[in-house]
């Protein structure tokens, strides 16, 4: 739906927006099929070196512009000899009361958050009370749609200079963690329709945050070593390191369909690779084997692509209708409940 909507919003028109969706579905299937009989998905990466066009330019700009030191300069400052968050409209951080800060910090001990961290893996490290000492806690506000209505915090760890590049040693190597409450997924509404489903689901994931972290680790090749779970105030929170290279690509930069299509191909290949990496079932066949078999014939791929494009177009129209309805209701204060 997003691919179709961005195409329409950028003036491509219905035909080219539908073509972009078909480009996605075709590339997705071909990418999955290319992984049958090999493990190439494990080494796939999207970098400036492996990309082209505007996406490559964007990745190069982010890499050159951002750094761990610059991130700490933006979000933190040294107060009375200790680093702390800057709470302002610019950082979108707000102060929390002392009791809440203490409860959050308590959740980040060895037997809490520490127990959920990987023991072996990329950049994984043994627990160190000094390194994982919580220096400050702030509430994150005004973030994306996925964060509305859920608790979200930034937690500042003391860290060490060894964790950053030489150019950033003066920053002290502090680590910023993004901590967000994880609500139940849509599938939770149907879990339990069959006897034993709820118990099976609970045996896989002790809480929803553990489910989200397991998914993140399965989908990425260089899994975030700080990805884990923190439980406080009766809720389970997903913990991730805030990447210094966090940025959003501006889709309005595309001037032609060809540029947009190349971007869609890159997104489709990335999505397909993540799905292949994250497959759970190994027998009787893996995800890539099932997809390859289901879409072996060209007519099957074409039928699926056209169906996805139709759903995307209908979904967009429904969202527009829903928004217009909500906007009209919001503008008519007399219709609001007393």
Listing of model-derived features with the role each one plays in the protein:
Residues 1-54, 58-61, 122-331, 338:
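Conserved ATP-binding subdomain of kinase catalytic cores across diverse folds
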Residues 55-147, 156:
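Acidic catalytic cores of enzymes that act on phosphate-bearing nucleotides/polynucleotides
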């Amino acid at each position: 739906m997003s691919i179709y909507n961005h195409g329409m919003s950028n003036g491509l028109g219905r035909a080219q927006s539908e073509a972009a969706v078909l480009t996605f579905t075709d590339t997705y299937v071909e990418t999955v099929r290319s992984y049958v009989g090999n493990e190439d998905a494990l080494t796939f990466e999207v970098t400036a070196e492996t990309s082209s066009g505007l996406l490559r330019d964007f990745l190069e700009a982010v890499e050159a512009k951002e750094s761990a030191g610059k991130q700490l300069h933006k979000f933190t400052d040294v107060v009375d000899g200790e680093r702390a968050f800057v709470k302002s409209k610019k950082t979108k951080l707000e102060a929390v009361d002392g009791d809440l800060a203490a409860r959050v910090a308590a959740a980040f001990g060895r037997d809490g958050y520490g127990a959920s961290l990987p023991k072996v893996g990329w950049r994984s490290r043994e627990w160190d009370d000094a390194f994982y000492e919580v220096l400050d806690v702030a509430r994150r506000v005004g973030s994306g749609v996925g964060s509305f209505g859920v608790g979200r915090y930034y937690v500042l760890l003391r860290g060490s200079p060894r964790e950053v590049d030489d150019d950033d040693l003066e920053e002290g190597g502090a680590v910023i963690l993004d901590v967000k409450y994880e609500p139940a997924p849509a599938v939770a509404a149907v879990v339990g329709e069959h006897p034993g489903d709820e118990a099976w689901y609970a045996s896989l994931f002790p809480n929803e945050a553990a489910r989200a972290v397991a998914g993140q680790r399965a989908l990425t090749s260089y899994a975030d070593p700080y990805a884990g779970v923190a439980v406080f105030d009766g809720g389970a929170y997903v913990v991730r390191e805030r990447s210094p290279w966090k940025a959003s690509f501006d889709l309005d930069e595309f001037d032609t369909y060809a540029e947009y299509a190349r971007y869609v191909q890159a997104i489709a290949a990335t999505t397909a690779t993540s799905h292949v990496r994250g497959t759970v079932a190994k027998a009787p066949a893996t995800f890539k084997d099932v997809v390859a078999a289901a879409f072996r014939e060209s007519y099957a791929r074409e039928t699926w692509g056209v169906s996805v494009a139709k759903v995307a177009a209908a979904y967009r129209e429904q969202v527009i209708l829903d928004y217009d309805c909500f906007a009209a209701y919001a503008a008519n204060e007399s219709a609001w409940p007393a």
